[in-house]
Amino acid sequence: MINPNPKRSDEPVFWGLFGAGGMWSAIIAPVMILLVGILLPLGLFPGDALSYERVLAFAQSFIGRVFLFLMIVLPLWCGLHRMHHAMHDLKIHVPAGKWVFYGLAAILTVVTLIGIVTI
């Protein structure tokens, strides 16, 4: 028999943010680490391409702000979702764990948004 009043789950929203963050962390973050952390210090990347003025101009553009926001927020949601489920799997039950982890992710998302807007 079909339940006439099904309980709606909020889990698809969090799984979507987790999946997007995991994909971003797997594809975009390693490229940024390679460019900024390895190629640039070794001198294998043109030095003026990532000069302070150019990076600041990019960070202040709309596309740059969106990129920075996604670079911070998506892996954050992925990591906190993973921590929430890891603690559940280890039978460590945090009181109101969903509120703790997803609330922290939401608060840090707002803080990041404020920081990105004020650049």
UniProtKB/Swiss-Prot annotation:
Q: Which GO terms describe its cellular component?
A: fumarate reductase complex; plasma membrane
> Which InterPro entries is this protein grouped with?
Fumarate_red_D (IPR003418), SQR/QFR_C/D (IPR034804)
TM annotation in the entry = 26-46, 55-75, 99-119
Q: Does the keyword Phosphoprotein apply?
A: no
What Gene Ontology terms describe what this protein does at the molecular function level?
succinate dehydrogenase activity
Q: Which GO terms describe its biological process?
A: fumarate metabolic process
Q: Where primarily located?
A: membrane
Instruction: Kindly give the Pfam families that the UniProt entry links to this protein.
Output: Fumarate_red_D
The record, for Gene3D superfamilies, names: Fumarate reductase/succinate dehydrogenase, transmembrane subunit
The way this protein sits in the membrane is described as: Multi-pass membrane protein
Q: Where in the cell is it found?
A: Cell inner membrane
Q: Which UniProt keywords apply?
A: Cell inner membrane, Cell membrane, Membrane, Transmembrane, Transmembrane helix
The record's family statement is: Belongs to the FrdD family.
Q: How does it assemble?
A: Part of an enzyme complex containing four subunits: a flavoprotein (FrdA), an iron-sulfur protein (FrdB), and two hydrophobic anchor proteins (FrdC and FrdD).
Q: What does this protein do?
A: Two distinct, membrane-bound, FAD-containing enzymes are responsible for the catalysis of fumarate and succinate interconversion; fumarate reductase is used in anaerobic growth, and succinate dehydrogenase is used in aerobic growth. Anchors the catalytic components of the fumarate reductase complex to the cell inner membrane, binds quinones.
Protein name, per record: Fumarate reductase subunit D
Native species of this protein? Escherichia coli O139:H28 (strain E24377A / ETEC)
What's the source species' lineage? Bacteria, Pseudomonadati, Pseudomonadota, Gammaproteobacteria, Enterobacterales
